[in-house]
Design a protein with these regions (language model features):
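Conserved beta-strand scaffold positions in the cores of enzyme catalytic domains, especially
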Residues: 38, 71, 132-134, 245-248
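Conserved catalytic-core segment of NTP-binding enzymes
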Residues: 148-248, 257
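P-loop/Walker-type NTP enzyme "switch/lid" segment
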Residues: 76-158, 260
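Short gly/ser/thr-rich secondary-structure transition/capping motifs
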Residues: 21-24, 114-119, 170-173, 206
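Hydrophobic positions on the alpha1 helix immediately C-terminal to the Walker A/P-loop
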Residues: 52
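The start of beta-strands in P-loop NTPase/AAA+ ATPase cores
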Residues: 37-38, 68-70, 165, 221
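C-terminal lobe/tail of nucleotide-utilizing enzymes
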Residues: 2-24, 211-289
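Extreme N-terminal, non-catalytic leader segments
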Residues: 1-47, 55-68, 77-79
Length: 289
C-alpha cells in the first residue's frame, strides 16, 4: 500500500503517491485554531448521548454566538442521525472502504486518483442544512486496523473542520475512536451519565483516559446527568474524579414519545423541559470553556 506512506512536516501533511510525488494539504488541529470550539460527547451506551447531542444541535443552532456549526456522528450506529431525522447519503466509512479497495487493487493509477481527490470525496460526504452541517462516520465493512488510512481520513476531516466555528461530536463510549479517526484534540469533553453505578464507572474510566491520552485536560471535562428523577441521587464517583457538572436533564415523556416514534428531536418545542435543560447546559458550557 504505497499511498499509505507519509512524510510529516510541521503544519503540513504529504500523501506519498506511487510515482513518488507528494500530494499536499494542510494538517490542522484544534490547538492551531483557538477561535474554533470542538465539543465531544461520550458515555456508556444507552445513557442518551445521541439525544443530548440532538438537543444540543437544536440549542446551538439558535444561538447568535455559535457561528458555523458542524455536527459529526462518530458512533457507527448513527444514533445521532436518527435523532436528527437524517439519512446520510455517504459516510466516512464508505470513503475508507473506497481507499482500502484502491490500495488492495494493485493499480497505482487507482491509488493516485483516490489520494488526489480525497479531500473532495470527504467534502462530498458533508450534508448541509439551514442551521448546521452534518457528517457521518458510519461503520466500515473492513474492521481491520489500518492506521495510515485512518490518518489520511483524519487529516482530510481536520481540513474540513477548519471552516467551522463550532464542532459537536457524538462519540462512542470511549475516547480513542474520536482521537484516532476524527480530530487530534477537543476543547470540551461532555460525559453523559444516567446516574447508575455502571455509568459512574464509565465516567471514571473516561476521566482516567482523558489524562492518559492528553485528549482533554480535566478542567475541560464536564458531566451531564440524563433522565434524572426528582429526589433520586446519582451513584457516587471516586473521590479523585471531579468533573464540572453542567446540569441534569429530567425524565421527559414527550421526548420518550418522540424517540419511540422516530420523530426528530429538533421538532420538540422550546418549552419542552428536556430542551430547556439542554439549553441551560449549553449556556453553562460556553460560560466555563
Amino acid at each position: 500500500m504505497n499511498f499509505h506512506d507519509f512524510r510529516r512536516h510541521p503544519g503540513v501533511c504529504f500523501h506519498v503517491l506511487p510515482d513518488g510525488q507528494p500530494h499536499e494539504h494542510g494538517h490542522f488541529s484544534a490547538a492551531a485554531h483557538p477561535g474554533r470550539r470542538v465539543i465531544a460527547v461520550c458515555g456508556k451506551g444507552g445513557v442518551g448521548k445521541s439525544a443530548l447531542c440532538a438537543l444540543m444541535t437544536h440549542a446551538l443552532a439558535h444561538r447568535t454566538d455559535t457561528g458555523r456549526l458542524l455536527v459529526i456522528d462518530a458512533d457507527p450506529a448513527l444514533g445521532l442521525a436518527l435523532a436528527l431525522g437524517i439519512e446520510p447519503r455517504h459516510t466516512i466509512a464508505g470513503v475508507r472502504d473506497e481507499l482500502l479497495a484502491a490500495a488492495t487493487s494493485g493499480s497505482a493509477q487507482a491509488e493516485q486518483e483516490i489520494a488526489q481527490k480525497l479531500d473532495y470525496i470527504v467534502f462530498e460526504s458533508l450534508m448541509e442544512y439551514e442551521d448546521y452541517a452534518f457528517l457521518a462516520m458510519g461503520r466500515s465493512r473492513d474492521l481491520g486496523c489500518y492506521c495510515s488510512v485512518n490518518d489520511l481520513l483524519r487529516d482530510a476531516i481536520e481540513l474540513l473542520i477548519k471552516d467551522f466555528d463550532c464542532v459537536l461530536i457524538d462519540g462512542e463510549a470511549g475516547l480513542e475512536q474520536i482521537n484516532r479517526q476524527v480530530i487530534a484534540a477537543v476543547d470540551s469533553l461532555i460525559c453523559v451519565s444516567d446516574g447508575s453505578a455502571r455509568a459512574a464507572r464509565t465516567v471514571e474510566t473516561l476521566w482516567d483516559m482523558a489524562a492518559e491520552n492528553s485528549l482533554v485536560p480535566h478542567h475541560s471535562f464536564f458531566l451531564v446527568f440524563n433522565r434524572q428523577e426528582e429526589g433520586v441521587e446519582p451513584a457516587a464517583l471516586r473521590s479523585d474524579v471531579t468533573p464540572h457538572v453542567l446540569g441534569s436533564i429530567p425524565q421527559d415523556p414527550e421526548l420518550t414519545a418522540f424517540d419511540k416514534a422516530g420523530r426528530p428531536l429538533t421538532e420538540l418545542s422550546h418549552n419542552n423541559p428536556a430542551f430547556q435543560a439542554v439549553n441551560h447546559i449549553v449556556a453553562h458550557l460556553l460560560e466555563h470553556s
